[in-house]
UniProtKB/Swiss-Prot annotation:
Lineage: Eukaryota, Metazoa, Ecdysozoa, Arthropoda, Hexapoda
Cysteine disulfide links: none
Family: Belongs to the TRAPPC13 family.
A GO cellular component entry from the record: Golgi apparatus
GO biological process, one term: Golgi vesicle transport
Native source organism of the sequence: Drosophila melanogaster (Fruit fly)
Pfam families in the record: TRAPPC13_C, TRAPPC13_M, TRAPPC13_N
Name of this protein: Probable trafficking protein particle complex subunit 13 homolog
InterPro entries per the UniProt record, alphabetical: TRAPPC13 (IPR010378), TRAPPC13_C (IPR055428), TRAPPC13_M (IPR055429), TRAPPC13_N (IPR055427)
Amino acid sequence: MEMVEPDAHLVALKVMRLMRPTLVGLGPVVTCEPTDLVQRFSSSQESDGMSGACAETLAAGQVLLLPQSFGSIYLGETFASYICVHNTTPNPVECVTVKADLQSNTSRINLSMHENAKSPVVLPPGGTIDDVIRYEVKEIGTHILVCEVNYSTPAGYAQSLRKFFKFQVLKPLDVKTKFYNAEIDEIYLEAQIQNVTTSPFCLEKVELDGSEDYSVTPLNTLPNGESVFTVKHMLQPNNSCQFLYCIKPKGDIAKNVDTLRQFNNVGKLDIVWRSNLGEKGRLQTSQLQRLPFECKTLRLEVLDAKNTIKIGTIFTFNCRVTNTSEHPMKLNVRLAAKFSPDSQYTGCADFMLNLLQSGESAEFPLSVCPSKLGLVKITPLVLTNTLQNEQFTIENVVDVFVVNSDYDNDTTTHQNKLIRYESAASCLTQKQVQLQVV
């Protein structure tokens, strides 16, 4: 048996991070061997009187570079490492166990190895045990991979070998959201995603997973199904792109104002991307919350209003008004057109509705005759509560596009339920959201 130094170990521990190579530029080639192609090219250029100065340098493109260290990784990507334990002695080593832990600023996670193997094991001379560990990093900051090997010497003494490998987990994306509360039940979400890495990547999927209380309609494709983006979501470093979604409350929630006030969580953004060499990453935002719903006194819904109508045709649309206050209302409805050459339509209305208790609704039709081509805005509609002497003015009731009588178009398209609120405020906010791993 050979003598082993006291500080030496009977086994060698090797750890290598598994990752795709990177593209690096080598810059111009200024020296080369005489037999190299570059040297021959340089000689021919020097003998050519028409060649310019510095033609002896040949710029090299990017080449693949294997990882030289643990480096860094981006949040949402999968950390993979190859761990190998080798018996460097001519004698067997008994009771060999290998353990790997990943330590962050807030947690310490055990990464299982050799799940189907018996532990501990006996390493014969020159023998090796190895395994690949994988973990999807879920926290930004400094991480330390702790690898520990325990074994017994031929004399029966327990020995331990431990190594530490430090790497950084960086933020790959910056996500900002803007909510637009329209004067209807619809909410529009604009999500801006910025690439904060040092290399380009491709956004493979950006979806808004709606909550159980809201339905989501993406607005990022053209009517023919093509994406609005000319390049398939390719983002260069520090560049950003925007995605738009329409969010609507479901079923009974949209009908009940009090219920609508309670449900503000609309869903989460699910983002999947790939690096320039195909490395996959996935992140999900925290729960996105819409702006607080405000409806002070009443709301008006426009039902079954056509988008397009021919000039000279009566434009009729139905309305529903709901008393959202805590006291009863006796409403007078008045729609008046200005009698002037510049008036866009003719027609008026002035009538009373039945008494509306709190939460009750009433429907009524309104009719006008457009007198101008183009987009005609029906406004204003004045609702007066005669019991409290309150007056509510709806500035923009509905829009209709008026065309010539020979215009050939399908006029069966109707606007879906448009819900307008009294005293609708500015409904825009911008918010930076928190990313998390799913």
